[in-house]
Amino acid sequence: MKWKEQAVILGVRQYGETSVILEIITRERGRYMGVVKGGRSRRMAALLQPGNFVEAEWSARLEEHLGLFRLEALDFHAARLICLPEALYALQLIAFHLRLLPERDPHPVLYDILHLFMQNFDEPFVNAELLVRFEMRLLEELGFGLDLSCCAATGRKQKLYYVSPKSGRAVCEEAGEPWKKKLLILPQFLVQRATRPADFRDIINGFNLTSFFLMRYVWEPRDIKQPSVRTNLIQLFERRFGIQAFIC
């Protein structure tokens, strides 16, 4: 068995005295692990860093085997990520989320968002918005997608300003006004065609929205606490944006 595909490195751990087990994410094959022989050498250290973009060739006698990786560097993102705490935290959070999905299960949309993030990780507003979109898509991939197509109460598709915490459906401004204290705010960049970057408050509202449903449907059922890296990341965004988020 053999395949070759572009990938982003997610993590690495020791395997024996000289090798490592590498974890990558590819578009067509999902999250994959394999052995890199000699991966603990100084020569390989710079390559095997989370965030680096590589061409990975995997081979094994049988498909179910762990297999071996051979790598070719395409872009050394990791060296620049170290200088950007928001981007570094975001990549760690994305890796945490991807590990909630089955290994070798392709999720091309999540990969595409990650790849776009890697191209814009030095733009904090852009990568904050992309991270919210990633978490929204993660909920959908796990079977808990929100319905933002129309108002749950009226069927209207315009002026969708809220999300019902009970149903996960959008609610328009008029129908939601009497109950707005019990509803979640819907970031407009999730329902309107983007004509400008999301503003600070929309981004924080996006994190509040995904926090609520990730806690309800993903973290609590799996007995997982909200990852500390996510809390740290949002606190960095709060300081940058000057707006406080509600953390579930």
UniProtKB/Swiss-Prot annotation:
The keyword Repressor does not apply. GO terms for biological process: DNA recombination; double-strand break repair. Pfam families: RecO_C, RecO_N. This is DNA repair protein RecO. One of its GO terms (cellular component) is bacterial nucleoid. SUPFAM superfamilies: ArfGap/RecO-like zinc finger (SSF57863), Nucleic acid-binding proteins (SSF50249). Belongs to the RecO family. Gene3D superfamilies: Nucleic acid-binding proteins, Recombination protein O, C-terminal domain. The keyword DNA damage applies. Keywords: DNA damage, DNA recombination, DNA repair. Involved in DNA repair and RecF pathway recombination. Signal peptide: none annotated.
